Every structure is written in C-alpha cells, then in structure tokens.
From Swiss-Prot:
It comes from the Bacteria. Its EC number is 3.6.1.-. It comes from Salmonella schwarzengrund (strain CVM19633). The lineage of its organism: Bacteria, Pseudomonadati, Pseudomonadota, Gammaproteobacteria, Enterobacterales. Catalyzes the hydrolysis of 4-amino-2-methyl-5-hydroxymethylpyrimidine pyrophosphate (HMP-PP) to 4-amino-2-methyl-5-hydroxymethylpyrimidine phosphate (HMP-P). The gene is cof. The keyword Hydrolase applies. This is HMP-PP phosphatase.
Length: 272
C-alpha cells in the first residue's frame, strides 16, 4: 500500500476546463482517511496552489514551480531552489530567435512583458494571473524559473538555442506541448519528491504518482508506482514504456483508478 500520493495538476488531476471534479475531490478525501499523505506536484505557483488547496479542506504538501519549492502542511518552506542568477540574466536579456512569449516566476508571482488573455483561461479556477512588467527589470537572483509559451515547433528550435547558451547550467523541459521551461539544474518534480519523501521518513518506493507531461518524467520514473494519463504527451509514454497508462483527465481517470485501487487492491485495473 502506497503511503504518499503525488499528483500533477494540469492534464492529470484537473479536467480540461481546469476544474477539479466532484469524484476527484471525494477520492482525495478517501486517501486521507486511509492515512495516505497527499502532495500536489505542479508547475503552478505556490500562491495559486494555496488558494486551490484552501477550497478543498484537505491537508497536502505542495511541490510547486516544477520542484523549485516544497511547502509543508503548515505552509513553511521545506526546500527551495532558484535559477543560477547568470542563467536567469542570460535568458531574460538575450534576444532569442522565437515568437514565444517569456514568463518569469519568483516568490512574488508570475511576470510577463505583455497582456496575453488566452493564458489566463488555465487559471479560471483560482483567479491567479500574471503581472505585466519590463522583464529585464526583474532581479536575476530572485528568479525561480522562466517559461516560454508558443508553437511547439518554434519552442523546439528555441530549446536548441537555449541548450547552446546554457551549457548544461539549467534543466529544460516541456511542461506542455506549448510551454518550455527553464529550471535550476537538477531541479524537477522527481528530485523534489525525493526530498519530501526523505523528510517524511519514506522512500520513493512508498510513493505513487500521476502525470501527463515531460515535466512529470522524473517523478513517474522514480516512484514505486507511476501512472501515465491517457491524454499524456506521446513523448512521455515513449520515455516510460514500462508504466501503465490510465484514462483521460476529462473522465477523472485518477479518481477512477484510485477508487478501484482502494476497493479492489488485488484485482487488475482496466481504464474502461
């Protein structure tokens, strides 16, 4: 029996309309009744996740910013990792050959250089939003991560540019088809979950995790039981071919799987 359950949010726990379904909320409560510790492992900001958590009346640890921060049940920082200031400075100030928009994150929020209302749709549940600012004015020593949002093919070309400029001083990953993230070197959900597991006196073998994108790869590949969403990026399924694929987030597949796991732990699972 797993003792710690880690959940990605977008494309996993959240439905396509970016809300949590009733069945999902009820199933999370059942896990807590079984004394299974919960953690939400997401690229979203802790300020947003605290608001979401407050609406659920659930105790959960928070792994946010794709592993750049870990917060306790009481809201205390258990772990923090920022981008190398030189890396942040280079990314923010260089004239990259891309049409993608740049987004900078630190403990104070989400910052971008122009209004992009379409990006707010993913945050309708919480009301969290960006602040429009001159990105070059942000102190480089306070940056947790930087994201680029745009066309996937354009982002693939941008990743080549970033890799050449970073010289392995940062971790690059796709948190969605249209979002490329620049993270601190060695920082990902898997490494953060290892820190949290150790803090709780557990091993990664005691954990189960759910995800759908390449920023979930390390987490899913390192736990005792990793589950991939049916709507996952094809690259993730190809990277972890030994892991089970469950149903679609639109059908609350995490809840469907966990209900079966709680009620019939010894029977094989089918997403149908």
């Amino acid at each position: 029996m797993a003792r710690l359950a880690a959940f990605d949010m977008d494309g996993t726990l959240l439905m396509p309309d970016h809300h949590l379904g009733r069945e999902t909320i009820a199933t999370l409560a059942r896990l807590r009744e079984r004394d299974i510790t919960l953690t939400f492992a997401t690229g979203r900001h802790v300020l947003e996740m605290r608001h979401i958590l407050g609406t659920l009346s659930l105790d959960a640890y928070l792994i946010t910013g794709n592993g750049t921060r870990i917060h306790s049940l009481e809201g205390d920082v258990l772990h923090r990792q920022d981008l190398d200031p030189q890396v942040a400075d280079t990314v923010m100030h260089h004239a990259w050959d891309t049409r993608a928009s740049m987004h900078v994150f630190n403990d104070n929020g989400w910052f971008t250089g122009q209004e992009i209302p379409a990006l707010l749709q993913a945050h309708v549940y919480s009301g969290f939003r960006y602040q429009v600012i001159n990105i070059k004015s942000i102190p480089a020593h306070q940056v947790t991560k930087i994201c680029f949002c745009g066309d996937h093919d354009d982002l693939i070309r941008l990743r080549i540019q970033l890799n050449e400029a970073m010289e392995e001083r940062a971790h690059l990953c796709f948190s969605a088809v249209d979002c490329l993230e620049v993270l601190p070197l060695g920082c990902n959900k898997g490494s953060a979950l290892a820190v949290l597991s150790n803090h709780l006196g557990l091993s990664l073998a005691d954990c189960m995790a759910f995800g759908d994108a390449m920023n979930d790869r390390e987490m899913l590949g390192s736990v005792g039981r990793g589950l991939i969403m049916g709507n996952a990026m094809p690259q993730l399924i190809a990277a972890l071919p030994h892991l089970a694929v469950i149903g679609h987030c639109g059908n609350q597949a995490v809840s469907h799987f966990l209900t079966h796991w709680l009620d019939n732990p010894h029977l094989p699972y089918s997403p149908e």
